[in-house]
């Protein structure tokens, strides 16, 4: 899935035109303060390009959080983003208190030349996702006629459409696939992300190592399956390693994560790895805890000793880190999706931190290192390594689906060239 046959912003004539742009400003917030502005910064080049090339206006639309179609301005307003964007762009940003309807259409119909306008959270309307919840929390579906009206209103806000929301590219939501304008182009962030993944998956440097962490095997089955056709080596770490170790080594895992569904296909995955000549590295030792808690009592365990009843593994141990480091040293290209321990808690962060240090070291010797968004991107922010690896993806779910070999609806909807 690349952008090679799709219209991109650098080929779009924006002079004198109103540009309506879907961005991903779904940033982490604490008490209405933005805690990581990576996604806002990432959209700036596309916005600046439009302004520098004489666009009449740039109307920005995004979601934030999961309000499920209910307006929650106190919790999920994009207003703080307008303030942040103003300081990043060095110019005024007009914030509108809705994203569709007559007042919004009027404000966007004939704005002053060079205006930047940010709409309120798209997901305050159930028509964006097509489903949500009502005020009492019951599931609701959007009516088709109302979805049409919502999409028609968004389409009135610009003359051309740009999608730079890679983080939402795997969602067939109204703002991603339903804006009906003659020209629909991918923005620079979308282009950068897709080019990186296309190169990594279609013509990788070898040896190619995938590092897969996270909790559930079942969630990552398609990922493991698809990557086994592409890589030379694979590290399987994090919570899902316990399902592998229990099935393959009959290891005692205590109350560690065990995935019943995933367990059924562990042997199939391992035989595919063998058939494809992929070297698999699993953890051999662990930092354990007597409960899932930041301040739990901690212990050590190995695959041979097993994890005692009532205890769980929350990080890999030093021997595993050594094995992981050896795999990283052999690689010329690395794709990393999912942490190898509960990195949010100091006591269980060492394994992921040690691995990050090795990946940074590998990058400095010329290895291509790609971090699939989500938790692994958060690790980069936490340890300040975002500019010490080749590419940190802004999209967790979107990068996951690309690595699984899927077509992204948001990219599919762009104009062909």
From Swiss-Prot:
AMP binds at residues 215-216, 220, 239, 313, 344. ADP binds at residues 214, 238, 343. Phosphorylated at Ser-203 by MAPK1/ERK2 under hypoxic conditions, which promotes its mitochondrial targeting. It is linked to Phosphoglycerate kinase 1 deficiency: A condition with a highly variable clinical phenotype that includes hemolytic anemia, rhabdomyolysis, myopathy and neurologic involvement. Patients can express one or more of these manifestations, and some affected individuals develop parkinsonian symptoms. Dysregulated mitochondrial targeting of PGK1 may contribute to the elevation of aerobic glycolysis seen in tumor cells, a phenomenon known as the Warburg effect. Monomer. Interacts with kinase MAPK1/ERK2; the interaction is direct, occurs under hypoxic conditions, and promotes its interaction with PIN1. Interacts with peptidyl-prolyl cis-trans isomerase PIN1; the interaction is direct, occurs under hypoxic conditions, and targets the protein to the mitochondrion by promoting interactions with the TOM complex. Interacts with mitochondrial circRNA mcPGK1 (via its 2nd stem-loop); the interaction is direct and targets the protein to the mitochondrion by promoting interactions with the TOM complex. The modification N6-succinyllysine is found at residues 6, 48, 191. It is found in: Cytoplasm, Cytosol; Mitochondrion matrix. The modification N6-(2-hydroxyisobutyryl)lysine is found at residues 97, 216, 220, 323. GO terms for molecular function: ADP binding; ATP binding; metal ion binding; phosphoglycerate kinase activity; protein serine kinase activity; protein serine/threonine kinase activity; protein-disulfide reductase [NAD(P)H] activity; transmembrane transporter binding. The modification N6-acetyllysine is found at residues 11, 48, 75, 86, 91, 97, 131, 146, 199, 267, 291, 361. Specifically inhibited by heterocyclic compound CBR-470-0. The modification N-acetylserine is found at residue 2. HAMAP family: Phosphoglyc_kinase (MF_00145). CDP binds at residues 214, 219, 238, 338, 340, 343. Keywords: Acetylation, ATP-binding, Cytoplasm, Disease variant, Glycolysis, Hereditary hemolytic anemia, Hydroxylation, Kinase, Magnesium, Metal-binding, Mitochondrion, Nucleotide-binding, Phosphoprotein, Transferase. Changing residue 378 to P: Loss of activity. It comes from Homo sapiens (Human). Changing residue 266 to M: In PGK1D; with chronic non-spherocytic hemolytic anemia; variant Tokyo. The modification N6-malonyllysine is found at residue 131. The modification Phosphotyrosine is found at residues 76, 196. SUPFAM superfamilies: Phosphoglycerate kinase. This is Phosphoglycerate kinase 1. It catalyses: (2R)-3-phosphoglycerate + ATP = (2R)-3-phospho-glyceroyl phosphate + ADP; L-seryl-[protein] + ATP = O-phospho-L-seryl-[protein] + ADP + H(+). Its EC number is 2.7.11.1, 2.7.2.3.
């Amino acid at each position: 899935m690349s952008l090679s046959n799709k219209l991109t912003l650098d080929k779009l004539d924006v002079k004198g035109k109103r540009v309506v742009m879907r961005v991903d400003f779904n940033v982490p917030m604490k008490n209405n303060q933005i805690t990581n502005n990576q996604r806002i910064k990432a959209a700036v080049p596309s916005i600046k390009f439009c302004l520098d090339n004489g666009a009449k206006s740039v109307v920005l639309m995004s979601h934030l959080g999961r309000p499920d179609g209910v307006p929650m301005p106190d919790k999920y307003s994009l207003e703080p983003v307008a303030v942040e964007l103003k300081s990043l762009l060095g110019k005024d940003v007009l914030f509108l208190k809705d994203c569709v309807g007559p007042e919004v259409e009027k404000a966007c119909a004939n704005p002053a030349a060079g205006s930047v306008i940010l709409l309120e959270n798209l997901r305050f309307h159930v028509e964006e996702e097509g489903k949500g919840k009502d005020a009492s929390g019951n599931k609701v579906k959007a009516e088709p006629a109302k979805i049409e009206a919502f999409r028609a209103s968004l389409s009135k806000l610009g003359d051309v459409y740009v999608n730079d929301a890679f983080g939402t590219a795997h969602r067939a939501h109204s703002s991603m696939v339903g804006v009906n304008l003659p020209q629909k182009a991918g923005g620079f962030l979308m282009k950068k992300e897709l080019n990186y993944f296309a190169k990594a998956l279609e013509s990788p440097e070898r040896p190619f190592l995938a590092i897969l962490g996270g909790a559930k095997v079942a969630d990552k089955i398609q990922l493991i399956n698809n990557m086994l056709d592409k890589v030379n080596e694979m590290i399987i770490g994090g919570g899902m390693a316990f399902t592998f170790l229990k099935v393959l080594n009959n290891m005692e895992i205590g109350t560690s994560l065990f995935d019943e569904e995933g367990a059924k296909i562990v042997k199939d995955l391992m035989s595919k790895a063998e058939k494809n000549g992929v070297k698999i590295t699993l953890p051999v030792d662990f930092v354990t805890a007597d409960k899932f808690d930041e301040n739990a009592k901690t212990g050590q365990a190995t695959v041979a000793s097993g994890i005692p009843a009532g205890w769980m593994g929350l990080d890999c141990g030093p021997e595993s880190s050594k094995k992981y480091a050896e795999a990283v040293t052999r690689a010329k290209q690395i794709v990393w999706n999912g942490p190898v321990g509960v990195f949010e808690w100091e006591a269980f962060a060492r394994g992921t931190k040690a691995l990050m240090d090795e990946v940074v070291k590998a990058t400095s010797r010329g290895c291509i290192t790609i971090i699939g968004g989500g938790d692994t991107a958060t690790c980069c922010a936490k340890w300040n390594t975002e500019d010490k690896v080749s590419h940190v993806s802004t999209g967790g779910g979107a990068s996951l689906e690309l690595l699984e070999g899927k077509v992204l609806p948001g990219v599919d909807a762009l104009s062909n060239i």
